[in-house]
Amino acid sequence: MPFPIFFRAQLSNILRNSPRSISTSSVRSTGARASMSPKSPLAPRHFLSIDDLTSYEFMQLVDLARKAKHAIESGQTPPSPKDGLAGKTVAMMFSKRSTRTRVSTETAVAYLGGHPMFLGKDDIQLGVNESLFDTSKVISSMVSCMVARVGPHSDIEVLSRASTVPVINALSDAFHPLQAVTDILTITENFPDPNGIKLAWVGDANNVLYDLAIACAKYGINVSIATPPSYPVPSDMLQLVRNAAHLSGSSIETTHEPEAAVKGAHIIVTDTWVSMGQESEKALKLKQFAGFQVSSDLAKRGGANKDWRFMHCLPRKQEEVTDEVFYSPRSLVFPEAENRLYAAIAALETFVVKRGYFGA
């Protein structure tokens, strides 16, 4: 999709008014929830997980992404450069390779008028010869935001504790909040009233699932998760989802039977079975995930909703989903991938430009 060159820093004024939704309190059960409202006007607010946000805040973030998409697609001319990232640098600290996250983040920063500075593991000290804490102290003194893609979630927690600017989680082994914003935007584009619909996750229990399940719960979407017995959802993550589901009245269930998970499902989702760093486990995982491939046959056997749709955050392997489904009209995969851009714009607009303020 071609993007207008003039769409730059002033996007914030176009996006400023988003409908208010019912607010609920955020549940914080584990970890250092660094993105709580700042204790002082000068303290940064970080975005490390969907669990860091109240339901109202998360809905506002998705609405902002939706408005960003509408502004770009309709060719609206932003009114003023002073409200964006003009004159600001966003450090993109990636210890893992990336396609969608890197491209969407760099593009989002550029649209908002800022300078994206990519810092890979071979460019700077990322816990090698210098502590992450010290690295964060130094880099945050020179930039306006750090977008970090790391391994252990503890790494991004250290970065956020030391940082004097907002830190946005671009992926950790525990959470992937930008993907969750993307996925809920995609879901609500296809199901305008998602409360009460069912999403089935078929595959590995991983970071994408955890934030997506929390996000679904905040929207009142029922979630059914099917994983092999050897790869259950960790109890602490399951509790986070249950807490959010309790507040919204939605349901969360787990099973080891894919057919049970997809019964009545409006959306079927899967992800990679072998994440980065798990290559040595590939042969074993392929055996243990036998029967978990998403296919039309699985949906039929399980009794999925007749109009079910399919999602996958990419990259995809054929053992995870058949070509028949992946490239079918049921598939939302490529619109979902495009929506990563609008999620990145919304996150930067909220946590950097507005300093974590979700009001109108």
Locate predicted features.
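Adenosine-phosphate binding glycine-rich loop
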Residues: 305-309, 313-360
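Rossmann-like adenosine-cofactor binding region
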Residues: 243-324
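Positively charged, low-complexity intrinsically disordered leader regions
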Residues: 27-103, 107, 175
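Anion-binding alpha/beta catalytic cores of soluble intermediary-metabolism enzymes, centered on
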Residues: 136-139, 144-215, 312
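Active-site cofactor/substrate anionic-group-binding motifs, chiefly glycine-
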Residues: 89-142
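Glycine-rich phosphate/diphosphate-binding loop of Rossmann-like nucleotide-binding domains
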Residues: 95-107, 189-270
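N-terminal mitochondrial targeting presequence
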Residues: 1-37
